[in-house]
């Protein structure tokens, strides 16, 4: 799928507008506000970093596999919910300052929506380990339990009429192979 | 519960060799080891009777006639079900005997398997 | 004669429906009560007769080719018992909601919602065809949604309601699978037809299992049940303990003859039930929210019912447990509702304690309900739970599953004792000057009625139900006492642990408790992992590749650009020079000529 995306992206770049895939949702933006093409040379890299107000060491665009966002920087996924509420933000509701580069999905990471950087009491990996461990342990033990069944020291229940051959939906025209007979124990 | 746990232990660790398999239970000839042939278990109710009385499938066993008697008594004395405690007891006793019969079958199978085991080991020693 | 009684029963229900539209809310409660009495009479008439089931109405609604959709009501033992239990419990809960919701401005609407739910539930249990079952099923689902989000201004309640309806939709897929498969393959939706055909189909049965798991909150689809506790307490009491959540088990009971013919599905349902009963019991152990403990114990008991339907193959016992469970669990919820209301909406058990002096009658009812839930001998729960444990013990079943059921049973006692210790017993830890008062007729009355029924219902039902399977008559004493024994052990352990953990000098925060307190991390992980996976896939393939890739290139967004390029070329060619046109003409003619020669 990435290959298809890359093909489409390359096609767009080569013979359409020479722009990256970031098109439709920002159609209203002017050309200067659009992210530029993926930076190839170190100079372009530095220029892109400067454009977004970042240091070159911090700047890292999305990989250019056809589904990237041009030179837009790949920022850490932080929801507004987990930002410090006591900081004097320029925008207190969205908890961001003027000139901050927003995450490319920042519309999904507002305070009413999802928070990808949620802090849990128990670490995430530990939680998964606990749940998978619980279910997996029980699953394995149920498998072994199926091998070693709970054994009650009685014979299977005996039923008359060939073990209820007809009642259990047997074919009346075709008699069962051998007739099952049950015997009493002698009275002592 | 303790009895069952110890039995389970025996079935899988202590006496693995001669614990019967409930899936293929009567593996010996029914008359093997008896002085005279055993009598066949008597089924009193017929298939048609049971079908007419709509006896549940699990209860169409050798006590079905007593179950049917109980149910008929219930129907006749419906609001006063204490009137049927005699029939209820009869059926319960029959089911109890059936359970004991199942236990006996199990024990017979177990002892025969043990005996077979013993015989085999004796033959091995003679050789 | 029998038909007459059936018609009377349906008429009483019809009158109940009419009273649903009355302006006076208590008259609806009265009508529910009298409908309950009428149906109790019907039940005894049915038991007296020789019939095991009756079909009413038999009205042909739609006729499509060879298929005809019949509307009829199936009145068998299960339906009649459930009618009586459901109407009795609903009547009490309606009276209780007059107390609990008395300050709510829309209490009339609330009672109408409860009534609509009741009608949907009765449709569900008396359904004769899968289609009617679907109507009742979706009816209870939507009423559950509306009632959980009753306090719609609270975002928690909204979230819980959405969770409930989403998880229920997953289960409904199973029901739709059943409907479609049976219509396409068998051309019949009626239960009579499905029973008579005696088919065994994995696809259909997986639908049954999925539907039951969704509605009855089995492991995997369970998080909505504890979340649904955000709704008002009468809702939790009616929908999420006694009636709606058992609809899944009821479906399994209806289809148990088919399930028991399929070994793999039977095993699957058995494992699902045992794992649910253990998981929910573990989660209930460390909850501090009073209603959540009761909710998890409900889920645990539902797991026990599912276990016994499939594992031991005794659907009648499961049904008995449904009836018993309805009485005492509805009462437990009402008691906790009374406590919560008296303590000004305080649900945290750590802030309760010593309520036996503040609210003695509620406390006694709470104790009776917990004892019945634990299976203390000769209360209602004992008569269903003890045979369940016994029948699981005397069958050659999966040994680990048997152990899990026993552990879960002991946990039942553990969390019940813990809850009792925290709320009713001990020293009072509530805020001072709480106007704790239980002198309301609409609180005490329903509680007492349900308490009496929790005591005697077991005897009555055992007395009237004719057994469908062999009762265990010759157990060794130790095995006979197994259920009581594990209950006792669980209770003692709970007592010990509570004393250990909640003294002043003790360590109260044990990290190992996080698994129990955070309900096994299941909702946290699943509610994050699955949406995240789908979100990433959506971003990758739908947004970047399709919307911003190929749509830009060739599809609507790209068409404009492509046409613009072509149009630009055409415009560029329009130079008004005759030589240019002639050149183009010659070129085209040469091309056509060349093609013709080549061909």
Swiss-Prot record, chain C:
Keyword Electron transport: yes
One Pfam family hit: Proton_antipo_N
GO terms for cellular component: mitochondrial inner membrane; respiratory chain complex I
Record has Transmembrane as a keyword: yes
Keywords of the record: Electron transport, Membrane, Mitochondrion, Mitochondrion inner membrane, NAD, Respiratory chain, Translocase, Transmembrane, Transmembrane helix, Transport, Ubiquinone
Catalytic activity: a ubiquinone + NADH + 5 H(+)(in) = a ubiquinol + NAD(+) + 4 H(+)(out)
UniProt subcellular location: Mitochondrion inner membrane
Recorded GO MF terms: NADH dehydrogenase (ubiquinone) activity
Recorded topology in the membrane: Multi-pass membrane protein
Stretches of the chain forming a coiled coil according to its record: none
Transmembrane portions of the chain: 1-21, 28-48, 81-101, 115-135, 171-191, 193-213, 233-253, 265-285, 302-322, 323-343, 363-383, 398-420, 455-475, 481-501, 510-530, 577-597
GO biological process: ATP synthesis coupled electron transport; electron transport coupled proton transport
Top EC class, one word: translocase
EC number: 7.1.1.2
Family: Belongs to the complex I subunit 5 family.
The protein's role, per its UniProt record: Core subunit of the mitochondrial membrane respiratory chain NADH dehydrogenase (Complex I) that is believed to belong to the minimal assembly required for catalysis. Complex I functions in the transfer of electrons from NADH to the respiratory chain. The immediate electron acceptor for the enzyme is believed to be ubiquinone.
Protein name listed in UniProt: NADH-ubiquinone oxidoreductase chain 5
């Amino acid at each position: 799928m990435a290959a298809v995306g890359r093909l489409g992206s390359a096609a767009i770049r080569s013979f359409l507008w020479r722009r990256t895939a970031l098109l439709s949702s920002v159609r209203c933006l002017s050309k200067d506000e659009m992210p530029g093409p993926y930076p190839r040379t170190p100079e372009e890299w530095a220029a892109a970093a400067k454009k977004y107000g970042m240091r070159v060491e911090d700047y890292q665009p999305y990989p250019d596999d056809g589904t990237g966002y041009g030179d837009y920087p790949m920022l850490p996924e932080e929801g507004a919910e987990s930002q410090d509420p006591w900081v004097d933000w320029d925008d207190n509701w969205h908890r961001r300052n003027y000139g901050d580069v927003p995450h490319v999905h920042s519309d999904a990471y507002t305070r009413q929506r999802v928070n990808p950087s949620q802090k849990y009491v128990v670490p995430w990996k530990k939680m998964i380990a606990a749940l998978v461990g619980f279910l997996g342990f029980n699953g394995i033990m149920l498998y072994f339990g199926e091998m070693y069944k709970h054994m009650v020291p009685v014979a299977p229940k005996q039923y008359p009429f060939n073990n209820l051959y007809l009642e259990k939906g047997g074919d009346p025209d075709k008699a069962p192979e051998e007739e099952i007979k049950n015997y009493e124990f002698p009275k002592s | 519960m303790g009895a069952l746990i110890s039995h389970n232990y025996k079935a899988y660790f202590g006496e693995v060799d001669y614990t019967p398999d409930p899936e293929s239970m009567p593996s010996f000839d029914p008359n093997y080891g008896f002085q005279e042939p055993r009598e066949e278990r008597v089924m009193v109710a017929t298939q048609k009777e049971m079908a007419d009385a709509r006896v549940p499938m699990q209860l169409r066993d050798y006590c079905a006639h007593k179950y049917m008697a109980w149910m008929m008594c219930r129907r006749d004395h419906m609001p006063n079900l204490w009137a049927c405690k005699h029939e209820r007891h009869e059926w319960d006793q029959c089911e109890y005997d059936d359970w004991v019969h199942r236990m006996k079958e199990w024990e017979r199978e177990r002892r025969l398997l043990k005996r077979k085991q013993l015989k085999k080991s004796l033959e091995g020693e003679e050789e | 004669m029998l038909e007459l009684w059936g018609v009377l029963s349906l008429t009483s229900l019809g009158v109940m429906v009419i009273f649903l539209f009355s302006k006076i809310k208590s008259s609806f409660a009265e009508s529910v009560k009298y409908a309950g009495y009428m149906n109790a009479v019907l039940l005894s008439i049915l038991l007296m007769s020789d019939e095991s089931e009756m079909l009413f109405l038999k009205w042909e609604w739609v006729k499509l080719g060879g298929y005809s959709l019949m509307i009829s009501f199936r009145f068998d033992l299960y339906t009649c018992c459930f009618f009586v239990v459901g109407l009795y419990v609903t009547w009490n809960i309606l009276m209780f909601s007059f107390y609990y919701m008395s300050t709510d401005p829309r209490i009339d609407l609330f009672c109408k919602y409860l009534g609509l739910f009741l009608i949907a539930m009765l449709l569900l249990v008396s359904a004769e065809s899968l289609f009617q079952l679907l109507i009742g099923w979706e009816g209870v689902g939507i009423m559950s949604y509306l009632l959980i989000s009753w306090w719609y201004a609270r975002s928690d309640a909204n979230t819980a309601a959405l969770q409930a309806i989403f998880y229920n939709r997953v289960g409904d897929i199973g029901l739709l699978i059943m409907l479609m498969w049976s219509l396409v393959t068998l051309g019949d939706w009626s239960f009579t037809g499905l029973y008579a055909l005696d088919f065994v189909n994995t696809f259909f049965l997986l639908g049954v299992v999925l539907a039951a798991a969704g509605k009855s909150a089995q492991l995997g689809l369970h998080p909505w049940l504890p979340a649904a506790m955000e709704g008002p307490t009468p809702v939790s009491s009616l929908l999420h303990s006694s009636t709606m959540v058992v609809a899944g088990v009821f479906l399994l009971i209806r289809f148990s003859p088919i399930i028991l013919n399929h070994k793999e599905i039977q095993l699957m349902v058995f494992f699902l039930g045992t794992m649910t009963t253990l998981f929910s019991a573990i989660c209930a152990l460390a909850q501090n929210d009073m209603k959540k403990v009761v909710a998890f114990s409900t889920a645990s008991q539902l797991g026990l019912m599912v276990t016994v339907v499939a594992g031991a193959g005794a659907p009648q016992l499961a049904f008995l447990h449904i009836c018993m469970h309805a009485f005492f669990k509805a009462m437990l919820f009402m008691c906790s509702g009374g406590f919560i209301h008296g303590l000004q909406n305080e649900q945290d058990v750590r802030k309760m304690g010593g309520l036996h002096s503040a609210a003695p009658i509620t406390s006694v009812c709470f104790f009776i309900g917990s004892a019945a839930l634990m299976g203390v001998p000769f209360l209602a729960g004992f008569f269903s739970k003890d045979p369940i444990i016994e029948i699981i013990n005397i069958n050659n079943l999966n040994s680990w599953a048997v152990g899990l059921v026993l552990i879960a049973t002991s946990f039942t006692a553990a969390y019940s004792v813990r809850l009792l210790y925290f709320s009713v017993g001990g020293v009072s830890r509530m805020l001072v000057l709480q106007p704790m008062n239980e002198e309301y007729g609409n609180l005490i009355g329903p509680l007492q009625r349900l308490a009496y029924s929790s005591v005697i219902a077991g005897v009555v039902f055992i007395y009237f139900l004719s057994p469908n399977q062999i009762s265990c008559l010759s157990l060794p004493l130790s095995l006979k006492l197994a259920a009581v024994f594990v209950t006792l052990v669980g209770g003692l352990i709970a007592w010990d642990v509570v004393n250990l953990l909640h003294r002043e000098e003790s360590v109260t925060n044990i990290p190992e408790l996080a698994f129990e307190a955070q309900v096994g991390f299941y909702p946290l992980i699943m509610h994050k992992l699955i949406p995240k996976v789908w979100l990433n896939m959506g971003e990758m393939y739908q947004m970047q590749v399709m919307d911003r890739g190929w749509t830009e290139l060739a599809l609507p967004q790209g068409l404009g650009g492509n046409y613009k390029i072509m149009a630009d070329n055409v415009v560029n060619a329009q130079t008004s020079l005759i030589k240019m046109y002639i050149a183009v003409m010659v070129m085209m003619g040469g091309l056509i000529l060349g093609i013709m020669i080549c061909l």
